[in-house]
């Protein structure tokens, strides 16, 4: 006991007695760059080994020199114990400028201390703008061509497209003349939309605008003639006339009077939704293009595909065997699903070479995308250099916003990546949350886009900018063939190249064009970014290899109980158990022959019995994926054949899983595999341990649920075809989330999504960012009031109340108009009510209760914002208290009987 006491006393003597100022932050971030706020907020923490030390005053100094000798602003000594959300109150900040700051703190015991941490923040573009930077998109027009990508009347189509088609349900849709996603012709053999006879439905997408028209073909074929039988389809385009033949019968003639159709790429479409289910099979595809040479017409077959080889000319779809013939089977799980030629279906890449004429003092890149993007300078991925020299990468940027109103841009310090002389910048952009199924068409189906501005500051005090314009080049022939939030990623390592380095051969690269589709506001991202969180990575607990099934169970070949290389033969399946339901992806290293295709699928659990009547979708021990619904959640990796092995992780998607299944077209050796957790890097500030294993597991489940579902936005689930920002789920869990981690800035961003999605009548959306379903539903729309109040309550964050007050008032006005059934206070809509309750609760009862609650909160919010008892906020607080009482009074009349019991109608 004496030894223990002496040891404790020794430790105490070693601790500093003076207070220390730690964790200096601006806008909840340590040394952030690229802030667009004109009034940044400062915070710090006071640490001391002595009990009872507290701050009594502070003084903040902001300067453009690291020593803070020439202040831009000083707060002066302020008598206050506040150390959070202290607002800058100096002269207007200059765009693209680094400001250093320090704070001096007086405390009640040890006197005065000044911070020693190197603390700074850097402004973004503010009102300085983008210096002429344009949103650009990829084209299929070679850089040396004289064709203007913006001119859609160039090069009239002269081609013949033939194929065998088996229409199995609904419609069979063929794309042709495709220059990009927004400029394409699509002809559908349609058996759904006319009760009497089938149609040829013509869809023409011109710069994203759709024109459609129909030709009935009942005099040639009935619906029963067309369904479930193979037919030969031919589409011929010459001299501005498009003729369509079925089994050599001319069924439709269309005149392209505006010359919109040109020779281009082809593809196929399947659609499911709105009582429509299109499924069809395609085979023996031949595309012939014609060129006039003098008096003769020369025919050239540019595509021939019968799907008999392991890899086809098309990216996606399912290859099935019918009567010994392999066919492309087009099926959509949900929404619009398109399969395009490999040459045009890769993820768009953009590049630019530029020359730094002088020695560089500093360099920044400001960039964003319509889609999910990654960024490279001189062959290096762009990220944030940390104090220890490591690089932290932001993933899935620019993250999800309501793209009809807002997009984020990122800022990176690229000084160390550049050099005097020749440099290259590259970006690749996938569909992300811009035009994929997760958006449900909310922002259109336009091509992805990219914008960037590089600011070079030279040592002689001069500066120069490089911006996105039509001098940039594009290609769709890179290694990332497909990237989609729901469906996964396809990566062909054989297509890797040095495209992000200077001097790269761009002979086969194409022009860019202006991407005109974003009409919103481009603002700097501020908050916790989506990152890989290394401390949460998972190694496999076990790996099971099996081949086929036996008696309803997987036929096990081997089980490995520790991480080890796994030799996987063609026809075998391996299942990795990561031991924890997580959100992110896997990073693996593999050896195998060039061209071998690995297919990785992800699931949260295994089939336990193999009994389909119990809901299993495979033999016992295989991964269960039925809960993914239409989300394919699949990673495909095509090996380049490196003898040393090749490492990979995806970058354009994420998965919710505990189990990873791997199959391969040829024998491979998986040298290693780990699960990497990906999510918004909110700083976790709590831990909780009890003597109860069950309670500890419950807490663990809560933490892992938050880590997984807080990815850019607060989602409802991370794995299936949903992953949406459901507002009801969010307001219920927001308080708990605030105890677990610092989510203040996370929710400041999300509340902007709510405001962007708010309808003109004041109703908040069911999901934010708005991409689906409705508006103005009780307990869901009320999140627009509940979440700001919760964040204020937990963090003393008045800014979130100030930013959203006008929006919240607009919502309260919406509620005030919901009168009916003889009542004045009905609250919001009743689509959901007491969602998933075991016992039914009257939905109007729920909405009235929430109306009273939001009125009470609005009174408290107004009180929090008032500066004196006579200002506008004080008056509004009084009005909302009165409203809450009136709702309560009507509620009692409506739901409380004479005995004082609650009674639902």
List where the protein language model places each region.
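Sec-dependent signal peptide recognition
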Residues: 2-8
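Small-residue (G/S/T/A) turn/hinge positions that recur once per unit in extracellular repeat modules
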Residues: 317-320
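Short, motif-level signal for alpha-helix interfacial/capping segments enriched in acidic residues
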Residues: 773-777
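Extracellular/oxidizing-compartment recognition motifs
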Residues: 20-98, 102-151, 158, 165, ...
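Hydrophobic h-region of N-terminal signal peptides that target proteins for export
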Residues: 10-18
